[in-house]
Regions:
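Active-site glycine- and acidic-residue-rich loops that bind
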Residues: 163-169, 197-214
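Short, structured loop/turn "capping" segments at alpha-beta junctions
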Residues: 167-172, 180-189, 223-224
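N-terminal presequence-like segments and adjacent domain-start helices
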Residues: 187-201
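Short amphipathic alpha-helix segments
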Residues: 203-224, 252-256
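A short interface-forming secondary-structure element
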Residues: 230, 234-247
Length: 339
């Protein structure tokens, strides 16, 4: 991809944003090489694109695979790395090995991000690279309870978007200039963000949440979460899609399918989808916006999405604004929710 993509005179992005993007790219270029903590969300994807421009083959995108990363997100990360043309590696670890993470206290994202970024540094050492960078952007530090950012600081992770003052809106503009398919992608917080603080994170809970959300995605919903309240599924649907969720056909199908996954009770949250509603600082509406799951985070951790989380990682310690459903095709409710 040509560096000229970022030139202000192309009209693709405002001059101020282009200048910030060039500053971030130049800062990356001063590194001997970088490993980008990569979730495939918009923040880490822009960092990866800038790093690829600046360093060529000395830039590597790395995604952390664990129980909290949906399989679909890993597949998407591989696809986006291919779009960018950057080498893509994966590392595997388990947050469930850490009792502090499993306990799911207010610092869960700190414990997760510390482990995740630690594996990134292991990968960097194996590759002979000294710098690990992430997708933290300039909006992230002011977004409420974000313990994952403490891990980024303690581990001396390079955050080129933050250092250049690039906001979330500017990240999306830069992604559009690069022609990235994730320019409008919301951050996808890690699956543990669906479990209320204080309730242990277990593989069983993570698995049933992932399967439940996969169903909603297959049924055509765009903005949603399934929160696991110890056997009670609280389904959150974006406000602009809530009317569809009130259809009796959906109610019957979601109750049947989620019960089969092991949920004892299935409820629809009439407040709709909002970011971080089970986190210590939860309760914001989806329309209010949030940085995300290193974006999406990771992150939750960022975005939920963090970026990040994290997963690669994104900066979001929880979820991020959901996309609109304006382009969703009309559906035959009788056929959409198969028995």
């Amino acid at each position: 991809m040509s560096n000229d993509t970022l030139a202000a005179e192309t009209g693709a992005i405002p001059p101020e944003t282009a200048a910030k993007a060039r500053a971030a790219r130049d800062a990356l270029g001063r590194c001997d090489g970088v490993v980008v903590a990569f979730s495939g969300g918009v923040d880490s994807s822009v960092v990866a694109a800038l790093a690829r421009d600046a360093l060529g083959d000395d830039a590597v995108a790395c995604t952390a695979r664990s129980e909290t990363l949906p399989a679909a997100e890993l597949d998407d990360a591989k696809r986006v790395a291919g779009e960018i043309g950057i080498r893509h590696e994966t590392v595997t670890f388990s947050e469930l090995d850490d009792p502090n993470f499993v306990a799911n206290d207010d610092d869960r994202c700190y414990h997760c991000r510390t482990m995740r970024l630690g594996r990134m540094y292991d990968a960097a050492r194996d590759l002979g690279i000294g710098t690990v960078c992430d997708g933290t952007n300039a909006d992230d530090p002011g977004e409420g309870h974000r313990p994952g950012l403490r891990a980024v600081d303690e581990l001396d992770v390079f955050s080129p978007l933050l250092d250049a003052g690039i906001t979330k809106a500017e990240v999306r503009r830069i992604a559009e200039a690069y022609g990235l398919s994730v320019a409008d992608k919301p951050s996808m917080a890690c699956l543990s963000s669906r479990i209320p603080t204080g309730l242990e994170v277990t593989e069983e809970r993570l698995t049933r949440v992932e399967k439940a959300e996969r169903l909603l995605r297959e049924w055509g919903f765009k903005g949603f979460r399934v929160r696991d309240h110890d056997g009670l599924a609280r389904v959150e649907i974006a406000p602009d899609e809530l009317e569809r969720a009130l259809d009796p056909a959906f109610a019957d199908a979601v109750h049947e399918h989620l019960s089969d996954l092991g949920f004892e009770y299935v409820t629809l949250d009439m407040a709709g989808y909002r970011m971080g509603s089970v986190s210590p600082a939860g309760g914001k509406t989806a329309s209010s916006g949030e940085a995300a799951s290193s974006e999406e985070a990771a992150s939750s951790e960022k975005s939920a999405g963090s970026e990040e989380a994290a997963r690669g990682t994104e900066t979001a310690d929880d979820d991020e604004t959901s996309p609109s459903n304006e382009d969703a095709p009309a559906v035959d409710l009788g056929r959409q929710y198969p028995r």
